[in-house]
Amino acid sequence: METTAFNTTSRIGNWSSAISPPLQTCGSFKCQLPTRRGVIVADLRNSNFRWRKATTTSRGNVAAEAVKIPTSVPVRVARELAQAGYRYLDVRTPDEFSIGHPTRAINVPYMYRVGSGMVKNPSFLRQVSSHFRKHDEIIIGCESGQMSFMASTDLLTAGFTAITDIAGGYVAWTENELPVEE
């Protein structure tokens, strides 16, 4: 199925086939949508991005399907979850992890440094599955909170059910003087 990006803001970025109707139209899905393709909808009516995959029916109505978005919590809440039995998955690079990491964290890199850039770890899901079961309670952290959010989204999409992203990552963890190992 071909997918179209459907954005409620005027700034589309590099999305091909993107359309940007006024926000009031998007809330009710009254705008004209392509009838034979999927549509990604960004709902910006509140402060959190809520992405949905929507498809049009034979009558042109839109049926929306929610895409799983990870829950993000502050580091102090993440620490409480770890104390309550959640396991910590650190998705930073091995070099970042070796400098220091939260106590009892397991490192499975989401990305690897290659030259001056980064590439996604092609074995990420398989490696995570070797340490965790799909229903394990897992908190996921990275350096600043961005990579862990992407990793959390991938894990939810892969069927993991108890995923919690750590907002602010290891930087916030150390700023709050939470326990680390070196």
Swiss-Prot record:
One of its GO terms (cellular component) is thylakoid. The keyword Nucleotidyltransferase does not apply. CDD domains: RHOD. It is found in: Plastid, Chloroplast; Thylakoid. Gene3D superfamilies: Rhodanese-like domain. InterPro entries: Rhodanese-like_dom, Rhodanese-like_dom_sf, Thiosulfate_ST/Rhodanese-like. The keyword Plastid applies. Keywords: Chloroplast, Plastid, Thylakoid, Transit peptide. Residues 82-182 form the Rhodanese domain. This is Rhodanese-like domain-containing protein 15, chloroplastic. The gene is STR15.
